Amino acid sequence: MYAVIKTGGKQYKVAVGEKLKVEQIPADIDAEITLDQVLAVGEGESIKFGTPLVSGASVKATVVSHGRHAKVTIFKMRRRKHYQKHGGHRQNYTELRIDAINA
C-alpha cells in the first residue's frame, strides 16, 4: 500500500517502513505525527484519488531526526567589472519514518 502526501509545499509518494526527508516540521525526535493531507491512496491495481484530498485518509509517521542538507553555493559575478559575491544556503529538514497508512 502506498500514499501520496503533501507537506511543506511538496508531494511525496510513501509506503510503510520508508524513511524520507521533508521540510522542517516543529516536532520532537521520536514524536508520532499524523499527516492528513493525503492526495491519493493505492494498493496493487486500485488507486483512489482525492478531490483534492482523500476523505478520512491519514498517514502516521515518527520523527527520526532533524538536520540540514548539504550547502548550496551561490556565486554572482559581473564580467570585466571586478564584482564578485559569494553566498550559501543550507535548508533544514526533518527525517520521517512512515509507520501506517489509514485509508
UniProtKB/Swiss-Prot annotation:
GO CC annotation, single: cytoplasm
GO molecular function terms attached to this record: rRNA binding; structural constituent of ribosome
Pfam families reported in the protein's UniProt record: Ribosomal_L21p (PF00829)
GO BP, one annotated term: translation
Keywords linked to the UniProt accession: Ribonucleoprotein, Ribosomal protein, RNA-binding, rRNA-binding
Source domain of life: Bacteria
Family recorded in the similarity comment: Belongs to the bacterial ribosomal protein bL21 family.
Job description of the protein: This protein binds to 23S rRNA in the presence of protein L20.
Cited NCBIfam families: L21
Oligomer and partners: Part of the 50S ribosomal subunit. Contacts protein L20.
Name of the protein in question: Large ribosomal subunit protein bL21
Organism: Burkholderia multivorans (strain ATCC 17616 / 249)
